[in-house]
Amino acid sequence: MSAKDERARDILRGFKLNWMNLRDAETGKILWQGTEDLSVPGVEHEARVPKKILKCKAVSRELNFSSAEQMEKFRLEQKVYFKGQCLEEWFFEFGFVIPNSTNTWQSLIEAAPESQMMPASVLTGNVIIETKFFDDDLLVSTSKVRLFYV
């Protein structure tokens, strides 16, 4: 195992996504929240989110995570897949993570134009969000969450 692989393994072993919520960015109202560690690789996670989230112009995502390891430049790359085809790609950067710390990270996700939105009935169960967790250029983990609109 290379030093990079070992480092990625150490970061992943000491990393936990404690909770996450999604809010309507305009009103601040929580639309969905969960405590499952959606960062765990190797399994397809599921999230049931309300259909009305698709009507929001922007969604505020709040993540609370703990890390045993220091990270120089913690960041996420996310791809939204519909039936296997990538529709959107997002990039988020948190930056420096203190070792043995718990952090809350808020990000704004702007919606696609309304003309490009598909109805919840078409999207439900067919959307997968793939999240890659990085420390700078070191890939730490890849996780997948299948969305169901309820």
UniProtKB/Swiss-Prot annotation:
It is found in: Cytoplasm, Cytosol; Cytoplasmic vesicle membrane; Cytoplasm, Cytoskeleton, Cilium basal body. Keywords: Cell projection, cGMP, Cytoplasm, Cytoplasmic vesicle, Cytoskeleton, Membrane, Sensory transduction, Vision. The keyword Lipoprotein does not apply. It comes from the Eukaryota. One of its GO terms (molecular function) is small GTPase binding. GO terms for cellular component: cell projection; cytoplasmic vesicle; cytoplasmic vesicle membrane; cytoskeleton; cytosol. GO terms for biological process: phototransduction; visual perception. SUPFAM superfamilies: E set domains. It is a peripheral membrane protein. Residues 144-150 are annotated as: Required for association with membranes. Pfam families: GMP_PDE_delta. Promotes the release of prenylated target proteins from cellular membranes. Modulates the activity of prenylated or palmitoylated Ras family members by regulating their subcellular location. Required for normal ciliary targeting of farnesylated target proteins, such as INPP5E. Required for RAB28 localization to the cone cell outer segments in the retina. Modulates the subcellular location of target proteins by acting as a GTP specific dissociation inhibitor (GDI). Increases the affinity of ARL3 for GTP by several orders of magnitude. Belongs to the PDE6D/unc-119 family. Interacts with the prenylated catalytic subunits of PDE6, an oligomer composed of two catalytic chains (PDE6A and PDE6B) and two inhibitory chains (gamma); has no effect on enzyme activity but promotes the release of the prenylated enzyme from cell membrane. Interacts with prenylated GRK1 and GRK7. Interacts with prenylated INPP5E. Interacts with prenylated Ras family members, including HRAS, KRAS, NRAS, RAP2A, RAP2C and RHEB. Interacts with RAB13 (prenylated form); dissociates RAB13 from membranes. This is Retinal rod rhodopsin-sensitive cGMP 3',5'-cyclic phosphodiesterase subunit delta. It comes from Mus musculus. The gene is Pde6d.
